[in-house]
């Protein structure tokens, strides 16, 4: 591999760190903002140079279309991470939240799963998400009405069906014993951590 300039090395480290912490590469705009570029175009030129040197692969047509070649990926842990207790203010995929890795092909889910979450409680039992199940989650930051999401409300992580009306979000259970969680975005914090894309029943397949 051809040697990197200091700026290229800085961008490559930023990409690796972002993937490790959030499960996703940064956008061009995020790279530009974090490293002080005047525009996303400046970041794009550095990304093209990194691609020519074989450090990254660029997938056209998507703002996060950056991936590390296989030899650049950290293979010390493989498979899907099972996320345990999530610390306040920390990314859900931060390494300290990972309890263990399961050898499950992420592509068996659609969209591809990025992590697993153990289900607590029976609030989603009517759609087959039960206590103790492993929920496969695709990492996203936005959701559409009707989707089942993993959401963080004031640092509590919950699995619910998403509905947004104006500046208010309702997180609906799939169990008549539970009332919706109402989140007024004007003064409450809500983070979408991902979409539910599959369920592994109480450790089946593992």
From Swiss-Prot:
ATP-binding listed as a keyword: no
Gene3D superfamilies, sorted: Umud Fragment, subunit A, Winged helix-like DNA-binding domain superfamily/Winged helix DNA-binding domain
Active site: 123 (for autocatalytic cleavage activity), 160 (for autocatalytic cleavage activity)
Protein family membership: Belongs to the peptidase S24 family.
Annotated InterPro entries: LexA, LexA-like, LexA/Signal_pep-like_sf, LexA_DNA-bd_dom, LexA_repressor, Peptidase_S24_LexA, Peptidase_S24_S26A/B/C, WH-like_DNA-bd_sf
Name the UniProt record assigns to this protein: LexA repressor
Top-rank taxon, per record: Bacteria
A molecular function GO annotation: DNA-binding transcription repressor activity
Organism from which the protein derives: Shewanella oneidensis (strain ATCC 700550 / JCM 31522 / CIP 106686 / LMG 19005 / NCIMB 14063 / MR-1)
Pfam family, one: LexA_DNA_bind
GO CC, one annotated term: protein-DNA complex
Keywords linked to the UniProt accession: Autocatalytic cleavage, DNA damage, DNA repair, DNA replication, DNA-binding, Hydrolase, Repressor, SOS response, Transcription, Transcription regulation
Subunit structure: Homodimer.
Physiological role: Represses a number of genes involved in the response to DNA damage (SOS response), including recA and lexA. In the presence of single-stranded DNA, RecA interacts with LexA causing an autocatalytic cleavage which disrupts the DNA-binding part of LexA, leading to derepression of the SOS regulon and eventually DNA repair.
Enzyme Commission identifier(s): 3.4.21.88
DNA-binding region: 28-48
Biological process, per Gene Ontology: DNA repair; DNA replication; negative regulation of DNA-templated transcription; proteolysis; SOS response
Catalytic activity line of the entry: Hydrolysis of Ala-|-Gly bond in repressor LexA
EC top class, as a word: hydrolase
Origin organism lineage: Bacteria, Pseudomonadati, Pseudomonadota, Gammaproteobacteria, Alteromonadales
Site (described: Cleavage): 88-89
């Amino acid at each position: 591999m051809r040697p990197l300039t200091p700026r290229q090395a800085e961008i490559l480290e930023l990409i690796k760190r972002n993937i490790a912490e959030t499960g996703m590469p940064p956008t061009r705009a995020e790279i530009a903002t974090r490293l002080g570029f005047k525009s996303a175009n400046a970041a794009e030129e550095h990304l093209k140079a990194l691609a020519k040197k074989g450090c990254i692969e660029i997938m056209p047509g998507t703002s996060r279309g950056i991936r590390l070649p296989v030899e650049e990926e950290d293979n010390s842990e493989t498979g899907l991470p099972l996320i345990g207790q999530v610390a306040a203010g920390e990314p859900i995929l931060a390494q300290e939240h990972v309890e263990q890795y399961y050898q499950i092909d992420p592509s068996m889910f659609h969209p591809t799963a990025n992590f697993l979450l153990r289900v607590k409680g029976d609030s989603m039992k009517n759609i087959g998400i039960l206590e103790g199940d492993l929920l496969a989650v695709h990492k996203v930051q936005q959701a559409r009405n009707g989707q089942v999401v993993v959401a963080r409300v004031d640092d509590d992580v919950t699995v619910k069906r998403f509905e947004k009306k104006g500046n208010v979000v309702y997180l609906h259970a799939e169990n008549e014993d539970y009332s919706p969680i109402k989140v007024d975005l004007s003064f409450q914090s809500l983070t979408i951590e991902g979409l539910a894309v599959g369920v592994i029943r109480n450790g089946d397949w593992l």
